[in-house]
Each structure stands twice: as C-alpha cells, then as structure tokens.
C-alpha cells in the first residue's frame, strides 16, 4: 500500500513540475503531457525547439485568390495561351498582370479555378440572353424617354451597311473557288454581312406593335443571336486564317447561294456539318497498322459540327442566313429547300 501511495505522489509531483495542473485547474489532457515529455526529450538531446508560429493576420484584400502562394512544385503548362485568355476573360480577370509571363498567368488561372469556382456558369440559353438584351433595350429607351421620330426606330436592329447589291455579289461569285483564298474570304465576308443587313432591314420594316409582340421579339433575338454566332467566323475571315477544309465548304455554299441553287447549297452545308466519313467524329486509327479504308477519311469529310461549340454556332448561323437568302432572293421551287422555314 505504501508503494502505491509513493507512486501516486511521484506522479503528482511530476505533473506539478510540468505545470499541467494548478489550484484553478484540477485536470489535464494526455496530449498536453505527451507534448511536455516530447519537449523535455528534445531539450535533453540538445535540439532547439521552434517557437509556435503566431497566427497569420487576416487578409484585408478584396481578392484573396491573388494573395495565395502555391507551395507545391511547379506543374507543366497544360493549356494554350489562347485558352488561358478565354477562361480569364470569362471570369472577368485581366489576361496579363504587369511583369507576368504566360506561365504565371496560367498559374493564376489555376488558383482562381481552384479557390473561386464559377457560380454563374452553366447551361446558357443564348436565345433567352438575346431576348433579355432586347427587353433591356426597350426598358432603357422607355426610361430615357424617346420622343418624336425616335419612337418609330427605338425597336430597330443595328444594320451593317455594305454598300453593295445582290447583283454585284452575284458577279463576284463567279470568281469563287478559283484558287485565290484571300479573295474568296473577302467575298464570303461581304455576302454574309450583306445577308445580315438584309435580315435586319426586313425586321426593322415591321410595324411597331409587331416588334413589341412575343413573336417579334423572338425574331429580333434570333437575328442578334445569329450575328453573335457568326462573329468568330468574321474574325477568321478578316485575319485570313480560316481552316482550309472549312473555307472550301463555305466557298461552295456561298457560290451555290449566289447562283440560287439552294438545294445544292444545302447539300454542301450537310456535307460540311455532318460529313460522310466512316467515323465522322475523327477516329482515324484504332491500331498501329493502317486500315484499307483509312485513306478515305480526310478532314474534309469529318463532321465539323462535332469539333467544338464555337464552330457549331457559326455553322448554325450560316444555315439561318441560307434560309434568309432563299426567302429574299427566291428561285424555282424545285431549287428551294424548306421555303417557309424562317
């Protein structure tokens, strides 16, 4: 019994020496005892104990993402510069900070995507966005108080004047597909912008009560949506960097449209959009050896509508302009396709 009392007294004295309990504290945690014993062990062995780090002050910056310091080793740049720019612009971030390299911008995008996930991104309805934009324009004009002659044009669409006629374009169309790619792209650009202008003028000529109706707003929104869909195509045409296979197909479509051969133009459109390759998505090799039918799979025959979303949109916009061209510049019914589609 004396041995047990002596052991209890020794343990109590040890705990008091380690300052684990006092008059105000009658108990302690085993983790505290283990930490004290560990400190004593390191002290006996001659190791210097690091002082506990002070709590870091809270950041007062409005953007805590930019203050984050990556401690892990650098990862390879897995995105192209164009893709990095596109994603940064979608999030409203600057595409390059002062003194920032392409890799630094990629790392900044990576931090933003990790710590600030997109909250307003999802399945976007482009047509609804265009209609909302038109409604907002109506509200702005009402609040601004348009008077007089402005009331007749307050619901009009923007018209891009090309200062050309369909007869001039038909004359230019005779030289399409003769090997001059720069000239072909200029003609394609003129024709598409001319058709957008014809469409906008037709919508602007409607009565005001028709423009205000649901169907009228839908037609205006469709025109605005088509114009936004075609903007990437116009950009490629201006910079003369349209891919050769897409350029060849669009050249055939425009040529047939100017000749008012709308059935042939529709066939060329389907050839470009859907294609007729054995594997239309672009699977050209399933093993290490070439197959007998592989030489039939060219980029021209691949379904471009499956490549990416941007390409799908301007291909869809091109189809709408084909319908507008057929509606405003008719020909024999045997050469028309879905005459009353739009």
Curated annotation (Swiss-Prot):
Q: Pull one GO CC term from this UniProt entry.
A: nuclear speck
| Major localization class | nucleus
Record-linked SUPFAM superfamilies:
Functional domain of the splicing factor Prp18, PRP4-like
Q: Which UniProt keywords apply?
A: mRNA processing, mRNA splicing, Nucleus, Spliceosome
The record ties this protein, via SMART domains, to:
SFM
Extract one GO BP annotation from the record: generation of catalytic spliceosome for second transesterification step
Subcellular localization is given as: Nucleus speckle
Signal sequence extent? none
Functional summary from the UniProt entry: Participates in the second step of pre-mRNA splicing.
Task: Tell me how this protein assembles.
Answer: Interacts with the spliceosome. Part of a complex containing U4/U6 snRNPs.
Please give the family membership noted in the entry: Belongs to the PRP18 family.
Please identify the protein, giving its name as recorded.
Answer: Pre-mRNA-splicing factor 18
Annotated source species = Danio rerio (Zebrafish)
